[in-house]
């Protein structure tokens, strides 16, 4: 078993066995622990879990979306990525403009009521079609607020004379001052966070350069361990690899530090199934070496080789 994947599975067991029982914002309930860390040595392979299939295409398109500074899900939908749909959808069905059947607590009700689940699918299709084809509707209901990419690329300037592009500043600083202890990327703005559809979960990253290698530590305040964390591990490992490529450095470690690491009660059976599966050798990440800027990567410039995995394990998302 890969040491990189083993630590993910071991932490899953720890959460199941020792986690506190906590209610949460979504009314689903969790097994929760506070304070955990995993270290992934990227020289041992790209840390995309193999004990279940993880959709790498969605990870790629989400990270490219972040790097665009975008906060509207239209770009994701154009790439058949629906991981952010539920929160803007919730904003729409709770608005005065929504005229369809009652969608209260749709995340939980779809799991229990087959008739309601069909109604939900119909309304969700209407929502997606309008985001893709109706500019006014997309502008009003397709955004998720000032989180992630919006703050990475367009942090509000305190002097009100523009915005701060953290990514550009970060890469330039790595090139000219790699020993800096200020190689920080943040996505938590206390002023705008209360108005976000879903406040940023992975809130701060720090880059570290030594002996020609660059590493990245990310702090995540809240971690959906079964659905979210496998994406987060791969996404920040991909970001680290892209930054390394653009700064002429070798890739070191991705260090994942978590505050509230939780397994939702309706994910327990799924993660137990995953724990029963075999693991495989980690895949290899290949980036197009001809890409000159981190902002110029396209989906086709990012490839994964030799990804051997177990089957998909589906689970409902807590909204």
Swiss-Prot record:
It holds the Pfam family Thymidylat_synt. The active site is at residue 201. One of its GO terms (cellular component) is cytosol. It comes from Oenococcus oeni (strain ATCC BAA-331 / PSU-1). DUMP binds at residues 25, 181-182, 221-224, 232, 262-264. Keywords: Cytoplasm, Methyltransferase, Nucleotide biosynthesis, Transferase. It catalyses: dUMP + (6R)-5,10-methylene-5,6,7,8-tetrahydrofolate = 7,8-dihydrofolate + dTMP. This is Thymidylate synthase. Catalyzes the reductive methylation of 2'-deoxyuridine-5'-monophosphate (dUMP) to 2'-deoxythymidine-5'-monophosphate (dTMP) while utilizing 5,10-methylenetetrahydrofolate (mTHF) as the methyl donor and reductant in the reaction, yielding dihydrofolate (DHF) as a by-product. This enzymatic reaction provides an intracellular de novo source of dTMP, an essential precursor for DNA biosynthesis. InterPro entries: Thymidate_synth/dCMP_Mease, Thymidate_synth/dCMP_Mease_dom, Thymidate_synth/dCMP_Mease_sf, Thymidylate_synthase. Belongs to the thymidylate synthase family. Bacterial-type ThyA subfamily. Gene3D superfamilies: Thymidylate synthase/dCMP hydroxymethylase domain. Homodimer. PANTHER family: THYMIDYLATE SYNTHASE, THYMIDYLATE SYNTHASE 1. Pathway: Pyrimidine metabolism; dTTP biosynthesis. GO terms for molecular function: thymidylate synthase activity. It is found in: Cytoplasm. It is an enzyme of class 2 (transferase). Its EC number is 2.1.1.45. One of its GO terms (biological process) is methylation. (6R)-5,10-methylene-5,6,7,8-tetrahydrofolate binds at residues 224, 318.
């Amino acid at each position: 078993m890969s040491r990189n994947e083993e630590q993910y599975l071991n932490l899953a067991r720890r959460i199941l066995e020792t986690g506190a029982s906590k209610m949460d914002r979504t009314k689903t309930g969790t097994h929760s622990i506070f304070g955990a860390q995993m270290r992934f040595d990227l020289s041992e392979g790209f840390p995309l879990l193999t004990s279940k299939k993880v959709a790498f295409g969605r990870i790629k398109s989400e990270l490219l979306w972040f790097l665009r500074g975008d906060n509207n899900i239209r770009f994701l939908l154009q790439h058949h990525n629906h991981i952010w749909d539920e929160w803007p959808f919730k904003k729409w069905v709770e608005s005065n403009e929504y005229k369809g059947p009652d969608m209260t607590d749709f995340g939980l009700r779809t799991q229990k009521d087959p008739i309601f689940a069909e109604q939900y699918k119909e309304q969700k299709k209407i929502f997606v079609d309008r985001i893709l084809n109706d500019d006014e509707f997309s502008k009003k209901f397709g955004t998720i607020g000032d989180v992630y990419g919006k703050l990475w690329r367009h942090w509000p300037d305190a002097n009100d004379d523009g915005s701060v592009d953290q990514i550009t500043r970060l890469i330039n600083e790595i090139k000219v001052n790699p020993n800096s202890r200020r190689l920080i990327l943040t996505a938590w703005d206390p002023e705008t966070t209360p108005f976000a559809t879903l406040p940023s979960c992975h809130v701060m990253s720090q880059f570290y350069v030594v002996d020609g290698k660059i590493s990245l530590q990310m702090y995540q305040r809240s971690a959906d361990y079964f659905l979210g964390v496998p994406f987060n591990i791969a996404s920040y490992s991909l970001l680290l690899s892209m930054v390394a490529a653009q700064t002429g450095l070798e890739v070191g470690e991705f260090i994942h530090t978590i505050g509230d690491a939780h397994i939702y009660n309706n994910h327990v059976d799924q993660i137990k199934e995953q724990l029963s599966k075999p693991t495989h050798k980690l895949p290899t990440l290949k980036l197009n070496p001809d890409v000159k800027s981190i902002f110029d990567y396209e989906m086709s410039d990012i490839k994964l080789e030799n990804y051997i995995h177990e089957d998909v394990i589906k689970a409902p998302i807590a909204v």
